[in-house]
C-alpha cells in the first residue's frame, strides 16, 4: 500500500512539474475551411487547441496594429503576403527559426527580409473560360490583352480581391506604371466587375460572360464538387512569365506580443511542415510549398506555370497598386 501511495505521489509531482501547453489564438485571413483543417490536424498532433478569429487579412492586420501589445492574437495567418509585410514594417512580428522558413523555401517563393514570416502555399492567377463559346486558341497570350474592345462585356474580374491587387503590382514591376494604369482603365471600360472570384466563375459557368480572371483554386473546388465532366468551364494558363501567370502566396507569422510564443511557433512550424501542408492541400487546391508534399487536386505542375518571378512583399507596393485602382475609377 505504501509503495502504491509513493508511486501516486511521484506521478502527481511529475504532472505538476510539466507545464501545461497553452491554447493559442490565430487571427486568420486564410479561407476558414483551409485554416480549420490545419488547426484540427495540429491539435490532434500536439494537444494544443487553436481558436480561429477569421476575417479579411487587411482587416486583421489593421486590427493587430491598433491593438499593439494588447493583441490577444498569437499567430497571424494571411492569404496575402502584403498584410504580413505591413506588420513586419511596424515591427510587430517575432523572428522565426530558420528551420521553419527553410521548409518552404524555393525558387520564386518570397522570403521575409527580417525572417519574421514564412510563405506557406501558392495560388495561380488563371483565365477561366466557357468551353461552349471559346477554345484555347481564342484566348490571349497576355493578360493585358483582355482589357480591350475585343472583350467588351465578355471578360470578368474581381477588383476587390487581394490577388487582383497583387496582379497590378506584378504588371507595374514587369511592364511599368503606365501599362498597369492602362490595363485597369481598359478593364473598367470593357470588363464586368464582380464582388468575388467565385461569383465571376459562376458568371462564366452560367454563360453570362465568356471568361474571367480568377485564382485557380476556385475552379478546382467547383469542379470537384460538381464533377469535372459536368461543368462548362476550363482553366487557361497564360504562362510566358506574363503577369497573367502570377503566383500569389499565403503566409503566417508569430506576433511579438504573444504570451504563448513557444506554442505559436510550433503552430507556424506545423503549417510549413509536411503534415500541415498535407492537411491544407487535402481540402484546398493551393500549391504546397513544402517540396515533399503533392496536392490531392489535379493541379497544373507549378514548374510548368512559367510564372513571373515577382511578388508583392512591401507595404509601399500595395499602396501604389491601390492608388492606381483609384485612378482607374475602380475604388
Curated annotation (Swiss-Prot):
Which CDD domains does this UniProt record tie to the protein? PBP2_Fbp
One Gene Ontology CC term in the entry: periplasmic space
InterPro entries hit by this protein: Ferric-bd, SBP, SBP_1_CS
Q: Sorted alphabetically, which keywords does the UniProt record give?
A: Ion transport, Iron, Iron transport, Metal-binding, Periplasm, Signal, Transport
Location comes to:
Periplasm
What is the protein's known function?
This protein may be a central component in the iron-acquisition system.
The UniProt record's further free-text remark is:
Present in outer membrane vesicle formulations which are used as vaccines in human.
Homology family? Belongs to the bacterial solute-binding protein 1 family.
Q: What is this protein called?
A: Major ferric iron-binding protein
Organism listed in the record: Neisseria meningitidis serogroup B (strain ATCC BAA-335 / MC58)
